[in-house]
Amino acid sequence: MDEDGERRVRTKRSCSPESSDNGSGDEVDWISDLPEALIVLVLLNLPTKDVIKTSVLSTKWRNIWRYVPRLDLDNRHFTEFDSLASFIDRFMRSNRKVNKFKLRCGSDLDGDVDLATCSWKWIYMAIKRKVQHIDVTWPGVRIYPEIYNCESLVSLKLSEVTLTKPEFVSLPSLKVLVLDWVEFYNEFAFDMLMSGCPVLESFTLCRRYLDNVRVLRVISQSLLSFNYYGSSSKSFRDDLVVILDAPKLEKLKLSHQLTASFIIENLSSLVEADIDIEFNFCRGKKFDPDDLPKREMIRNFLVGLSRVKTMTIAACTLEVIYDYSRCEPLPLFPNLSFFSVEFYQKRWEILPFFFKSCSNLKSLVLESDYFPRKRTSIISEPRCLLSSLEYVKIEFALDKGKMELVRYLLENSPILKKLTLSLDHSSRKKSCVILRELITIPRCSTSCRVIVL
């Protein structure tokens, strides 16, 4: 065993201060003296390869690894797949209970064992042993319908696999679902999966291209957190639709520029949203003011987010909102207290309009990689008194154009307590100039502190 591995499983100390003083060298292995059940509990936190290493510590440790109800293996730790398969077979036969089944397999497996048969057999055996957590990464392997019916399963994580057609889905205990680059049988199969998880609380979906689902319906009465990601592959179809109906949802993350439509039915409990989408306005596609169905979809999307308290928006999303705002007024966000936004080009023009919709905004974070060189845009827009704003953090290089934004915030925020400027290396060289200009800017708030980092 390597030194680091031994340090994790063995702790020694002197029997007593007297023996230490006498230099007797007598030591006690305190971990080995623990009850076997407690040792097994400790070993549950280690990968299986490290658990097996403990068998060389002493006679007592020789077979303890066999009673650890957790399998966590990576095929890279085996010279060939046949050896991996043989080990898993022995492990599953010797354990009546398996709490967690975690397996990482590459796509270049050598051996005579049939992969599909192995995946079916091992998952079936884990289910029979009342498994609570399944975590499988196995490019291209087919996961058979047994996975859809497991009363004990609490969390399910599948990566790069293909799900077969379900006849029936019943996952009454499943609370966490993570699907990463998974291919579904069809849309109806995905709908069945969602409807068969009555207590699901967290769902993360990282979509692959051509996953056989055009309209993705995430409908759940129990869901608290939903994270949605998509690939930027050119093979992605351009008519993808996401329908979200989750009245208990509190946290939402959307990140995929190529999904054309997001339809929000009910997000009445939403607290936090992180939005990085542009409704497929990319690869040459532009916002069309005359496309009334698209405008209605965007309007309903923004209204669906209107109860949120904390929101982060990417530059591409702000671009769409800016184009939309020139056609229709933005909805109100009466609960929004924290707003973080990344923007570029001239899209900071939207800020005064957006501020009008946020009557209770208290904290604002602004990030940008690019600003227009001209001192324009915001000064010509209608002035909006930021009556609730207390904290502002600006994270980008400062120049004359960006100082106009700082001026706008200082002059229109009557209860602002702190404005923090986080400068990059180039801006720090001009810090004296920046500080002199800051001093000359009138402040609407008499108690505002300006901090330059």
From Swiss-Prot:
UniProt cross-references to SMART domains, sorted A to Z: FBD (SM00579), FBOX (SM00256)
Transmembrane segments: none
Keyword Transcription regulation attributed: no
Region (Disordered): 1-28
Keywords of this entry: Leucine-rich repeat, Repeat
Compositional bias of kind Polar residues: 14-23
Repeat (LRR) residue spans along the chain: 155-179, 210-235, 246-269, 305-329, 358-381
Pfam families in UniProt: F-box, FBD, LRR_At5g56370
SUPFAM superfamilies membership: F-box domain, RNI-like
Highest taxon, organism lineage: Eukaryota
Domain (FBD): residue spans on this chain: 373-423
Repeat recorded as keyword: yes
Domain F-box: 28-81
Descriptive protein name: Putative F-box/FBD/LRR-repeat protein At1g66290
